[in-house]
């Protein structure tokens, strides 16, 4: 067996295991952890998210499309995921890439191109000059917009520009200006906390300056600046 065939077999085996974990309760869902001791798991609050929910199945299905045709079972799963995410996107208020509408945009664009317009429209409705208010209570009692890629404005900008469509430029412009407004000027250049003024800082991509700088570059290109 060639190395490529071995990797393919491993990937198919892992995917088959994931498929066996898909449950049904008003649409498909996945348990975050699989334990033989937990006889009757229930859907988590983030069941639809890109991070640990059904939206996270979309990149896998898209990768499968590059290698082979979907099976009937895989196609049915994709259709169920799309229906569930479309219904949720119409009322969802969490904006983020990994836990909210940004993830809806990503998954819908991958599984049913064009349907992501619903989630993008919702993001356009929810945007403020400071970005998008969070539901994650990163700081107790506060819904102030976050800045980072995972939970904040940077991730929303990246998702919207990647997906494109009528709302993409407005989201990129508003998000980019919000990020610039949230920046702190230092001797070394601009720097960001996950909320403006927060003492803790990170240089990393997921929650820090590298990711925000990348989102600003993408936003600037989308806005022709």
Spell out what each predicted region is.
Residues 108-174:
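Internal, well-ordered domain-core segments that constitute the primary functional module
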Residues 46-63, 95-110, 145-162, 201-218:
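Well-ordered alpha-helical segments within folded domains of soluble proteins
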Residues 53, 74-85, 89-93, 97-104, ...:
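Generic hydrophobic, aliphatic-rich segments that mediate packing or membrane embedding
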Residues 3-7, 46, 70-74, 93, ...:
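Residue-level recognition of alpha-helical structural elements
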Residues 21-43, 82-97, 126-147, 180-203:
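Glycine- and aromatic-rich loop/turn segments at beta-sheet edges
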Residues 166-225:
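Extended ligand-binding clefts on enzyme/binding-domain cores
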Residues 1-67, 71-77, 121-123, 173-184:
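Low-complexity, Ser/Thr/Pro/Gly-enriched N-terminal "stalk/linker" regions
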Residues 17-20, 24, 63-66, 87, ...:
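Positions within ordered alpha-helical repeat solenoids
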């Amino acid at each position: 067996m060639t190395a490529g065939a071995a990797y393919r077999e491993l990937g198919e085996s892992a995917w088959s295991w994931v498929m066996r974990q898909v449950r049904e309760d008003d649409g498909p869902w996945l348990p975050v952890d699989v334990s033989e001791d937990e006889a009757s798991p229930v859907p988590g609050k983030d069941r639809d998210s890109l991070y640990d929910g059904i939206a996270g199945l979309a990149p896998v299905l898209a990768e499968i499309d590059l290698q082979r045709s979907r099976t009937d079972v895989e196609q049915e799963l994709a259709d169920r995921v799309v229906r569930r995410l479309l219904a949720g996107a119409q009322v969802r208020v969490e904006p983020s890439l990994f836990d909210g509408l940004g993830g809806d945009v990503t998954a819908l664009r991958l599984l049913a191109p064009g349907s992501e317009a619903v989630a993008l429209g919702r993001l356009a409705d929810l945007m403020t000059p400071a970005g998008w208010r969070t539901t994650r209570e990163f700081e107790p009692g506060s819904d102030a917009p976050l800045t980072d890629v995972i939970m904040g404005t940077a991730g929303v900008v990246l998702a919207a520009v990647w997906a494109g469509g009528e709302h993409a430029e407005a989201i990129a412009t508003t998000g980019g200006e919000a990020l610039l407004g949230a920046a702190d000027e230092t001797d070394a250049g601009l720097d960001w906390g996950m909320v403006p003024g927060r003492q803790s800082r990170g240089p990393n991509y997921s929650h820090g300056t590298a990711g925000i700088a990348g989102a600003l570059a993408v936003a600037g290109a989308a806005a022709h600046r």
